[in-house]
Design a protein with these regions (language model features):
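Single conserved hydrophobic/aromatic residue that forms the stacking wall/gate
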Residues: 1-11, 15
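Glycine-rich anion/phosphate-binding loops
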Residues: 25-44, 87-95
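Catalytic-face loop-and-helix region of soluble metabolic enzyme cores
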Residues: 147-154, 166-237, 250-262
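Active-site-adjacent beta->alpha loops and helix N-cap segments on the catalytic face
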Residues: 115-135, 181-196, 245-252
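Short, acidic/polar
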Residues: 85-100, 154-165, 218-229
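N-terminal small/glycine-rich loop or linker at the start of catalytic domains
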Residues: 17-25, 53-89, 136-153, 198-213
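Conserved, mostly hydrophobic/aromatic
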Residues: 42, 101, 109, 174, ...
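Catalytic beta/alpha-barrel core
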Residues: 90, 94, 107-116, 172-180, ...
Length: 264
């Protein structure tokens, strides 16, 4: 609650509720409960702000991150054909999370940090199924992760291939987040902006991690790099990923207010 409140004070328009890899801690059976509770807290912060300010431009996005297993890659280098999880099992796992987020009151579903597009397709399939069952029309955002200088996701897709893979699904936005800082992500978001007619998003890390895994890029440095995206008019939605704090969000929001969003 304190984190959401701090970010809201820094003019964050979209509050993200998130959880990741519960199975690593033997807590996967609580997936629905964690996501329901997290979404409920974020919605309470949103409602409190909107009631106090009489404003309604704040949204809660339910963040659906990567699992600790991939459908396209083998965890065993000696058995490249092996898969640690099936598509159907992923759909079932994602369904629990999606149900928790929706029941908790999110306004948007945000499938993010996608390094394996087949996993993302399982998440999107689960979302579509639940939307049909509940007769809901909730917006869906998608955000991939370019893992290195090759310009590809971990499962080997380029920007263009990634977009084509999910272009059959009605989406609010397509973007990139995590792994890279704002300066490294810029060329890939440019390519994305040129080939999609949906809104685009970017949530970079605060630079690259240092030798201790911490992020040293200051809020001022990051906001200056984000301004390059705004000057080139290639994004509609902007935020931060690893290493970003409320101060980063505040300065990014201040810079973004001076520019119009990308036209589609």
């Amino acid at each position: 609650r304190d984190l959401h409140t701090d970010n809201r004070r820094q003019r964050q328009m979209c509050i993200r509720d998130r959880s990741i890899s519960l199975a690593d801690y033997g807590m996967e059976k609580y997936a629905y409960d964690f996501n329901y509770a997290g979404a409920k807290i974020a919605k309470e912060v949103k409602d409190e702000f909107c009631n106090n300010t009489k404003k309604s431009e704040v949204f809660v996005a339910g963040s659906i991150g990567p699992t600790n297993r991939t459908a396209s890659l083998s965890p065993d280098v000696n058995d490249p054909g092996y898969r640690a999880i099936s598509f159907d099992d992923l759909v079932n796992c994602y369904s629990e999370q999606v149900l928790g987020l929706i029941d908790g009151g999110v306004d948007i579903l945000f499938v993010e940090t996608i390094f394996d597009t087949l996993n993302a397709k399982a998440a999107l399939f689960a979302i579509d199924k639940i939307k049909s069952e509940k007769k809901l029309d909730i917006p869906v955002m998608v955000s991939g992760t370019i893992t290195d200088a090759s310009g590809r996701t971990l499962s080997g897709q380029t920007v263009e291939a990634f977009v084509i893979s999910i272009s059959h699904i009605p989406l609010l936005s397509i973007g990139f987040n995590c792994a890279l800082g704002a300066d490294q992500l810029l060329p890939y978001v440019k390519r994305l902006s040129n080939i999609t007619n949906t809104y685009t998003s970017v949530h970079p890390n605060a630079g690259l991690p240092n030798a201790f895994g911490a992020y040293d890029q200051t809020a001022t440095e990051m906001s200056e790099l984000i301004e390059n995206y705004l000057k080139e008019n290639i994004i509609n939605i902007v935020g931060g990923c690893c290493g970003t704090k409320p101060e980063h969000i505040r300065l990014i929001a201040e810079v973004a207010r001076n520019y119009k969003p990308r036209k589609i």
